[in-house]
Swiss-Prot record:
Gene designation per UniProt: GAMT
UniProt-recorded name of the protein: Guanidinoacetate N-methyltransferase
Impact after mutating residue 106 to P: In CCDS2; uncertain significance; severely reduced enzymatic activity
Annotated effect of mutating residue 164 to D: In CCDS2; uncertain significance
Resulting phenotype, residue 54 to P: In CCDS2; loss of activity
Length: 236
């Protein structure tokens, strides 16, 4: 029997998008794993990394946009920062219900926004956010490695205030890249991510990264590399 990591996350041509919104959000009993349509969406071992992303997105205070709620790991950390408002886009029905239950208990105002970011983001005004954290799950084999670029190019730059910060991840993609193509995570980011950030309008001198050591559990299907990279991308 093959190891869990040997099973591809997406089959050729697979597209989960039509079924994703209404698919059950399967949180395990210990609340350590979230799966949707059998996909490993989030696992609690990611917590230190999610906290680093949250710290980046909330570093300017003000109004923060989070795309993807998941297990509320990053969202709960954002709430610890001195922010004013916390806008969160989430498309899955079950995850959104968890967001609705979570929101009233938070220190800072939460604005839950239901739907795919592709539908919600175009309705948001330019220059509205001091920080953005984009961490959604790829919904098709076609967009496995590229979905974040669609958001970054079409929305992230315009939604940020001048001086605002974008951070994001695509662990499902980056885990595969670090397994199959790269041994240096900073070079991976430089070669596969920076060109899209430049195309979106960010300047090279405003693109920084921080690397942390974090060893995933052996049974994690989507990430095995013992480091994680946090982008810190400022709108000049």
């Amino acid at each position: 029997m093959s190891a869990p990591s040997a099973t591809p996350i997406f089959a050729p041509g697979e597209n989960c998008s039509p079924a994703w919104g209404a698919a059950p959000a399967a949180y395990d009993a210990a609340d350590t794993h979230l799966r949707i349509l059998g996909k490993p969406v989030m696992e609690r071992w990611e917590t230190p990394y999610m906290h680093a992303l949250a710290a980046a997105a909330s570093s300017k205070g003000g109004r923060v946009l989070e795309v993807g709620f998941g297990m509320a790991i990053a969202a709960s950390k954002v709430q610890e920062a001195p922010i004013d408002e916390h806008w969160i886009i989430e498309c899955n029905d079950g995850v959104f219900q968890r967001l609705r239950d979570w929101a009233p208990r938070q220190t800072h105002k939460v604005i839950p926004l239901k739907g795919l970011w592709e539908d919600v983001a175009p309705t948001l005004p330019d220059g509205h956010f001091d920080g953005i954290l984009y961490d959604t799950y790829p919904l098709s084999e076609e967009t496995w490695h590229t979905h974040q670029f669609n958001f970054i190019k079409n929305h992230a730059f315009r939604l940020l205030k001048p001086g605002g910060v974008l951070t994001y991840c695509n662990l499902t993609s980056w885990g595969e890249l670090m397994k199959s193509k790269y041994s240096d995570i900073t070079i991976m980011f430089e070669e596969t991510q920076v060109p899209a950030l430049l195309e979106a309008g960010f300047r090279r001198e405003n693109i920084r990264t921080e690397v942390m050591a974090l060893v995933p559990p052996a049974d994690c299907r989507y990430y095995a590399f013992p480091q994680m990279i946090t982008p810190l991308v400022t709108k000049g």
